[in-house]
Regions:
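Metal-ion/cofactor- or nucleotide/acyl-coenzyme-handling active-site neighborhoods
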Residues: 1-141
């Protein structure tokens, strides 16, 4: 298993900078989106730069960057896995939001767009999930 922290939204990184300063695993983030102030706060954190661009409703994967439809960590993390040539992606703890929560629809749209992208490995939830993705019991793997 690879142990990484992933963050792409500069405002969230700024808000969570103190927590990141205590992590022992690398943080993958688009360095160009981080302000100098945030970078200074993260000076003791090993940051792996993976660039990101926004592109309407689609994903594109490259060696050191990707285009994603929304600046959501799940989209960024999926694009990192695809760019790294992962064969499969298993999700645990992605239980999702309640059926009437608009965020459920947004994340479902991200998963739908991702599944259509060229070079996207399959995504399977191995714990219960409200998202519209393939599900499989962890005990059947």
């Amino acid at each position: 298993l690879i142990h990484l922290y992933v963050a792409c939204n500069p405002l969230k990184v700024m808000a969570e900078a103190k927590q990141y300063s205590n992590i022992s695993s690398p943080l993958v983030a688009p360095i160009k989106l981080l302000s100098d102030q945030v970078r200074k706060k993260l000076n003791k954190v090993k940051i792996l730069n993976f660039g990101v661009g926004l592109q309407d409703s689609s994903f594109k994967f490259y060696n050191s960057c990707s285009n994603i439809p929304k600046l959501y960590t799940v989209a960024y993390a999926l694009s990192i896995a695809a760019s790294g040539k992962a064969n499969k992606i298993y999700l645990a703890g992605f239980d999702g939001y309640q059926k009437n929560d608009r965020r459920l629809k947004i994340i479902d749209e991200i998963f739908q767009s991702y599944s259509k992208a060229k070079g996207a490995p399959s995504v399977t939830a191995i714990t219960p999930s409200n998202y519209n993705i393939q599900k499989k019991s962890i005990y059947t793997l």
